[in-house]
Amino acid sequence: MTAREQLAQFAAGSKALGKLCREYKNRSATVHLEELVGGALSFYAAAAVAKSGGVHVFVAEDRDAAAYLMNDFYNLLDERQVYFFPSSWKRSAAYGAEDAQGVVQRTATMHAVRNFPGKGYLVVCTYPEALAERVADAEALQRETIAVKVGDRISIEVLEQALVDAAFTRVDFVYEPGQYSVRGGIVDVFSFSESKPYRLDFFGDEVDSIRRFNISSQLSSDKLDRVEIIPDLNAGVPASAKVSFAQFAGAEASYWFYDADFVLRRVNDIRRRTLSDMEHPDQIDSLLTSRNSLLADLSGSRIFLLRDNLSLIHISEPTRLQL
């Protein structure tokens, strides 16, 4: 029996899971999950996610724990609906050295959250350093996105100008996000929301086909009807359009914390250390949120706590649920 089959069998007969799903129906519920040890949280949470649907953000204590949790959900759920939301910086936001892979994973997650249809589920695994960073708000993400579909009447010159305006760099062959190339009637472009670039074939001023392709072999992997090309949101979005990820995801999202108090203290520590290292401290609010701001943005959401150590004015008294 596979892990998913075991999960389905468990979900069908568990009274405790039924209680958990009933609590989930309360939009602003705060629930303390008692007596969960080892991998039990992953199992119960995956069952609740599959049964209840919606957007679920799991906040582990560090990057490694978040990655392990993601792997658990890969085995228990549809891995296409499980996303990793890491930090976009190699060291600290103060030094401005981006981690390209982290930026792509963050952008892909934001794109998935923004386009969540309301049916099914979406799981996000993250940790304090990533949650502390501000992101482009939904309006800015929409504004910066270049949408192209098969059959669109658009010239290569117009598309290229849009890519230049979005700070994409022209190269001979694309190999990393933020690049594009033009060869005859073909435009290759590497969006910050994808692990593979797109190849757009033009017939005159009409988009004839869109495909993903492998960088090394140059072979197409799949055909697409429509794509959304997203630039580096860290570079192109003004401070006034930056919000916490909790605000971006909205009050409908649910949050699962291994140790909420640790996460909030860590967010404040990151902000304080970054502030002391910054050459222009007045820019801190464009980079990082604060403990109090994050709490305020979480106040209308469902919160599930593995440890009942979050006694704060912004969050309701937790319901105790023994599993």
Which sequence ranges carry the predicted segments?
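ASCE RecA-like P-loop NTPase motor cores
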Residues: M1-L312, S316, R320-L323
